[in-house]
């Protein structure tokens, strides 16, 4: 028990509940109309779930941005004592979501681009294209499985299934036969 005086805490709202309205001062500073309702809101993936229709038990989605997420809607609290997945209340009142998150999904590809793809960045600039287009073509030259090379994307530690802020990235199975395209494909896979 934390013994925190409830008077010190703000009220908790469900995502769609109106918590107030935009004040005249905030309207002047932001350009929003005074009186516009302000709601409890939602986290990025909880909001994405509503936007993509993942609002019933058993529905799910995945996203890859800086991090990678697998998100599933559930009507009941399902807490994994080992912490292999996260459980949160979601944007649908009375419901929950379970998700797995890896910190370094898209981040790993950007890191690889910035550290090892200077030539692709330079060529792409001269071609008025995105360097990722050239990186995709290079990765396509490596077979599925990147010639048995695995990449663990722990550039910023890890959240699930192994919560460990000290976890570090690894190329596993690296040998003298591997080429840059194999490393790139391993990162993508």
Language-model features: locations:
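A glycine-/small-polar-enriched, mobile loop at the entrance of the PLP active site in fold-type I
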Residues: 7-15, 98
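Active-site-proximal cap/lid insertion segments
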Residues: 4
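Active-site core segments that coordinate phosphate-bearing ligands/cofactors
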Residues: 1, 18-189
């Amino acid at each position: 028990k934390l013994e925190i005086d409830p008077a010190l805490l703000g009220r908790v709202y469900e995502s769609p509940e109106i918590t107030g309205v935009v004040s005249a001062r905030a309207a002047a500073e932001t350009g929003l109309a005074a009186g516009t309702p302000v709601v409890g809101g939602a986290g990025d993936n909880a909001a994405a779930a509503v936007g993509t229709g993942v609002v019933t038990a058993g529905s799910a989605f995945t996203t890859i941005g800086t991090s990678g997420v697998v998100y599933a809607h559930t009507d009941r609290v399902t807490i994994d004592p080992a912490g292999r997945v996260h459980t949160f209340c979601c944007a649908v009142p009375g419901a929950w979501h379970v998700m797995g998150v890896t910190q370094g999904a898209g981040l790993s590809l950007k890191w690889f681009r910035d550290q090892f793809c200077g030539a692709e960045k330079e060529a792409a600039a001269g071609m008025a294209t995105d360097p990722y287009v050239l990186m995709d073509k290079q990765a396509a030259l490596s077979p599925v499985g990147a010639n048995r090379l695995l990449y663990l994307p722990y550039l910023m530690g890890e959240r699930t299934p192994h919560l460990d802020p000290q976890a570090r990235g690894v190329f596993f199975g690296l040998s003298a036969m591997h080429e840059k395209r194999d490393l790139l494909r391993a990162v993508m896979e």
